[in-house]
From Swiss-Prot:
It comes from the Eukaryota. GO terms for cellular component: ribonucleoprotein complex; ribosome. InterPro entries: Ribosomal_eL22 (IPR002671), Ribosomal_eL22_sf (IPR038526). The gene is rpl22a. Belongs to the eukaryotic ribosomal protein eL22 family. This is Large ribosomal subunit protein eL22B. The lineage of its organism: Eukaryota, Amoebozoa, Evosea, Eumycetozoa, Dictyostelia. One of its GO terms (molecular function) is structural constituent of ribosome. One of its GO terms (biological process) is cytoplasmic translation. Pfam families: Ribosomal_L22e.
Length: 116
């Protein structure tokens, strides 16, 4: 019987965090990219990205490409921590718009005032 080698295909995941709504006003996208680069853990180690996780910036969007299993929920957690760190968590929220995309949006304060 011939020896058959199985090849393992690595799935790549692409996640997007869209900061277009508050882009130029209060969120510094470059600082957010650096924050993610410094805080994302790979194999339980911070700043161990290597070629497994690639973080890039496109105007007001952060794009994270991974070849390892990676949780979208972990990106939401880090985004909320960044907003809290910059003390803008009271104004912005993180909303999932598609399967692989998060978006920063302002809270709808005007709707709650009109209902009263």
């Amino acid at each position: 019987m011939p020896n058959v080698q199985k090849t393992v295909v690595k799935k790549s995941h692409k996640f997007v965090i869209d900061c277009t709504a508050p882009a130029g006003k209060i969120v510094d996208v470059a600082a957010f990219e650096k924050y993610l680069h410094d805080r994302i853990k790979v194999d339980n180690k911070v700043s161990n990205l290597g070629s497994n996780v690639v973080i890039s910036k496109d105007k007001s969007k952060i794009i994270i490409n991974t070849t390892i299993p990676f949780s979208k929920r972990y990106l939401k957690y880090l985004t909320k921590k960044f907003l809290k760190f910059k003390q803008i968590r009271d104004f912005l929220r993180v909303v999932a718009t598609t399967k692989n995309t998060y978006e920063l949006r302002y809270f709808n304060i005007g709707d709650s005032e009109s209902q009263e």
